Amino acid sequence: MNLAYIPSPTFSKFEIGPFTIHMYAICILIGICVAVWILTTRWKRYGGTFDQILDTTLVTVPCALVGARLYHCITTPADYFPPTGNLVNILKVWEGGMAIFGGISVGTLVAFLWCRHKHYPFAIFADAIAPALPVAQAIGRLGNWFNQELYGWPTTLPWGLKLNDADAIGKSEICYSGAQCPDYRTTLFHPTFLYEMIWNLIGAALIIYLGHKLADRLKAGQQFAMYLMWYGLGRTWIENVRINYSTVILGLRTNVWTAIIVFVLGCILFVVLYQYGPDPKAQARGLAAVTADELERQSIEEEQLRQKKQAKRTK
């Protein structure tokens, strides 16, 4: 019997009147808010404004969440598609199942298109959000803790995770493989949600540190490439500790393949940007010019609106 362990929460949702509030959703929401705060702080240093980030967030985040959900459903089709699954389950996001790789892919594409539409330099937007993403992901992982999901193999380590939900053990790959399920009351499991939280927070700190230390040497976009490399590397080993059911291709879990691809893409992007990437200072000057133009138009529109209101009062 292990005397030291990490307990699981005794609840994953609560009621406020007729509404059911899921902790999984709260964790994701808090993560998004913290990420927006970090992103805004860094974006302003480049010469941007909060309104620019707010508009970008309102466009990008919903698309990223849809991408995260669809990626999860596509890579674990048994629960969502016939003959074994139900399409209605795709809509049950409160039960968990948001794959960050899908969110990153769709979110990056939408952010790129939006920045292009608004004439914002995407490379420094990517750098600004680089440490914000892993922080948001770290906070979001707490949702897996509340749902008692995505844990790892059995362990005797003093930081092992203790489950208190009989249904939680059925979510593991051990049961899917036909082996006897371990007794959740006496077995501890690797808290992979915690491993990823720590890994992500270290990554965010490293990106901020290196971005400051190497400010004169880095090209615009290289900090985002660091994020891709760090997260891809981390998910490669963390994914091999997890035992939730996952589609296996050529002996490796789907997310391991995706993590490897993300890591390689990050390496390639880092090298290419080092050779051909834009100068961050030039990009910042471009953003400052766009911001000044937006503020001028906004001032003109506000003045026109004020004059219209004044004209109505004098009639």
Swiss-Prot record:
One of its GO terms (cellular component) is plasma membrane. The chain crosses the membrane at residues 19-39, 93-113, 188-208, 256-276. The keyword Membrane applies. InterPro entries: Lgt (IPR001640). Pathway: Protein modification; lipoprotein biosynthesis (diacylglyceryl transfer). The keyword Membrane applies. It is found in: Cell membrane. A 1,2-diacyl-sn-glycero-3-phospho-(1'-sn-glycerol) binds at R141. Its EC number is 2.5.1.145. Its main location: membrane. One of its GO terms (molecular function) is phosphatidylglycerol-prolipoprotein diacylglyceryl transferase activity. It is an enzyme of class 2 (transferase). Pfam families: LGT. One of its GO terms (biological process) is lipoprotein biosynthetic process. Catalyzes the transfer of the diacylglyceryl group from phosphatidylglycerol to the sulfhydryl group of the N-terminal cysteine of a prolipoprotein, the first step in the formation of mature lipoproteins. Belongs to the Lgt family. PANTHER family: PHOSPHATIDYLGLYCEROL--PROLIPOPROTEIN DIACYLGLYCERYL TRANSFERASE, PROLIPOPROTEIN DIACYLGLYCERYL TRANSFERASE. This is Phosphatidylglycerol--prolipoprotein diacylglyceryl transferase. The gene is lgt.
